[in-house]
Every structure is written in structure tokens, then in C-alpha cells.
């Protein structure tokens, strides 16, 4: 029998090049702010996006077909474990995370205002004057030029308005990103810093589906409603911001909470607005007026009635607007309301 010799190259299996398709989703906190883009892996075998990280085996695996996309991962987390927030804060050895709401993104050093050392002991009286001077010069060197000074003022104004309106953290971050984008494109020249900050906050509220009206923002800012609206339209066009019309449903939780209405009324109002949207009754009408009318109808139907004046004061509309929207909703949705 003749045995043919097989070379090593002939026995070598053909290599299969695996190319990972990379997608970049918009992800920051609750997926409303575009700050950092994290790579999303797509399985090259089945095309699934259900990719899981197995920390015990240090592998990235496709949940659908089991293909191992990456192995021998490094654990970049802390070496300690914490079981509650208090332990996490106590054991952490790093500072606050980076934020866009501070002009230097929170990366510079800040001297604490309390006159205590690293052990928590009071600083002696003879060293307090020196600490005061260090603190003063530290504040000065954080702002190096006029542009940083203007940015610091704008972000402080933005934070002040957001605090007055009780807006969450993600809205503030989003507004800061929009304002920085306006600065980079030179959109601030010829306009007031307060006006651009208020307009950026209004756009961030709409993007994050935490709606606030122009009147509400103008009430706590130093500019009028007309200027905020004009600046908002300008920066939306220049920054290519595409925002859908405000949904009246987004106003219902806040209005219902201020009126101290139970959850049943809120759910009923949302149901009414969803049916109204399917029939096109919300198009071309102010979202606050439609939401106020739906809440008024729901409160009557659920036996926890609020007067039109009470609802109008919370929603920032007139009683006439509520009556007009009330008439449209009850007639087109066949809602029998006994007053």
C-alpha cells in the first residue's frame, strides 16, 4: 500500500475571518442623552444582537447560537464588593463622574469649603487664612479665559433654571451638550447667553420626553417667551435637531400629581388621549389643553372631580380652552359624562 505524504500546509484548515459589525446606539443613562457611544456587537454567524458577557468564563457569547465573539476579557471593575449604596460610596476611591454640566467637565481639582483636613479634624486658625487664599486662587485658575468664563456662567444659569423646574439629571446633561454644540458652531454671537441656555433646556426637555412649556421656562428665566422660542427654532435648525411634536400624554403624570389625583384617573386620562390620537383629535391643538381636558374628563368619570379652574391653573391654560377640548373629546369619542 502506497501512503501519500501530506504536508502540513495541506492539513491546515482554511481560516475563517470573522468581521464584527459595529453599531453605535444612543445610550446615556436612560437613552435620552447622546454623550458617549458604546459599541454594540452583532453576531457574525446568526446576526443576532443578543450578546451577553460571561464574567465567570471571561467571554462575550452570542445568546442565540453560542458563538464566542471574544475571550480572555479583563475585569476593569473595582476589586471590592458593595451590597448597598452606603458601602459603595465608602469604598470608592475615585471622584465624581465626568459631567457636561460643569465647564471643565468636572475633571479639575476643587478645594472643599469646609475647614477640615483629610482626617476630618478642624484646621487651626493660623492656617485658615492660607486655605482661604488657596481656595480663592483655585477658583480663578479653573477659568482660564473669557470663553470658559462665559461657558461657566451659561451652565450655572442652565442649572439654576433646571433646579427651579425640578428637572432630572439626564435633561440637564442633554441641555449642556446642546449648549456646547451651539458654542462650537458659533451660534451664541449676537444672542444672549440666558436665551440660548433656556432654549437648549427647552429642546432637552422635549428630547427627553419631560415636557415643559415655553411659558414655564420663561417664568423662571431672565428672558421672555418670544426670545426663547425664536432662539430654540434657530439652534434646532443649525444643530439639525429633529424633534417630534410633544405628546399630550407626557403632561398627564405631572398634572395628575399636582392635582393629587389617584392612579386610576391618570390611567383613564392616558387611555382617552391614546384614543384621541388615533382619531387625530390631538393634531393642531395645544398639548397642554388636550391633556388638561382629558384629566378633567377622567376625574369626573372616576368620581374624584376637580373643577375646571383647578385643572386650568395647573396646566397653564384657560377654562375656555378646557371646555373646547372637553367638547371635542366627548363628542368624537362618545364619552357620556354626567356633571
UniProtKB/Swiss-Prot annotation:
PROSITE patterns: TFIIB, ZF_TFIIB. Zn(2+) binds at residues 43, 46, 62, 65. SMART domains: CYCLIN. It comes from the Archaea. InterPro entries: Cyclin-like_dom, Cyclin-like_sf, TFIIB, TFIIB_arc, TFIIB_CS, TFIIB_cyclin, Znf_TFIIB. A zinc finger (TFIIB-type) spans 39-70. Keywords: Metal-binding, Repeat, Transcription, Transcription regulation, Zinc, Zinc-finger. One of its GO terms (molecular function) is TBP-class protein binding. It holds the Pfam family Zn_Ribbon_TF. One of its GO terms (cellular component) is transcription preinitiation complex. GO terms for biological process: transcription preinitiation complex assembly. The keyword Metal-binding applies. Sequence repeats lie at residues 156-239, 250-331. NCBIfam families: PRK00423.1 (NF001658). Belongs to the TFIIB family. Stabilizes TBP binding to an archaeal box-A promoter. Also responsible for recruiting RNA polymerase II to the pre-initiation complex (DNA-TBP-TFIIB). This is Transcription initiation factor IIB. The gene is tfb.
